[in-house]
A protein has these predicted regions:
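Haloarchaeal acidic low-complexity proteome signature biased toward cell-envelope/secretome components but also
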Residues: 1-26, 30, 46, 90, ...
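Short amphipathic alpha-helical elements of helix-turn-helix/winged-helix folds
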Residues: 21, 33-37, 49, 53
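Beta-strand-connecting loop/turn residues
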Residues: 39, 93-95
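Short acidic, hydrophobic short linear motifs in intrinsically disordered regions
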Residues: 41-50, 56-66
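Glycine-rich loop motifs involved in handling phospho/adenylate chemistry
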Residues: 65, 95-99
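Charge-enriched amphipathic alpha-helical scaffolds
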Residues: 67-78
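A short, conserved structural fragment
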Residues: 79-93
């Protein structure tokens, strides 16, 4: 386990720490996926989904390099940082990660992530309703 094991379960996170953690898109994707799953997740599963979102494709459409790049950065950098902040429980030896109780403190800082890409919907709606002049 990471040094996050030494933190109290409900330690109050500072805004500076929250902003530092959330400034990276890969970490935001990680937190979103873990929240969706609401269970311990294997690192390989997490890496595949994050890579798919980053590359705007499906898990099946990923290349080996895309998978490996995300897996490596999650393993070496992002999950240890989230664990040290007390936001996830990360067992590096088993390759399993899940949200900790402190993750709830991030709710007000994260934009809601819907399954539907609303920006594309609104763009399509605007294009179809625009009248030519």
């Amino acid at each position: 386990m990471s040094s996050a094991d030494n933190l109290p379960e409900q330690e109050t996170l500072s805004e500076d720490l929250i902003f530092d953690v959330l400034k990276n898109r890969r970490r935001r994707y990680t937190l979103h996926y873990l929240k969706q799953q609401d269970r311990p997740v294997e690192l390989s599963e997490l890496a595949e989904q994050v890579a798919a979102w980053e590359n705007d494709t499906t898990v099946e459409g990923l290349s080996a390099n895309e998978r490996k790049s995300v897996y490596t950065s999650l393993y070496q950098t992002h999950l240890p940082k989230l664990a040290d902040a007390g936001i996830v429980d990360y067992n590096q030896n088993r390759g399993v990660v899940e949200l900790s109780g402190n993750a709830a403190q991030l709710e007000g800082y994260l934009r809601p992530q819907d399954e539907f890409p609303w920006i594309r919907y609104y763009l399509g709606l605007a294009l179809t309703t625009a009248s030519p002049r």
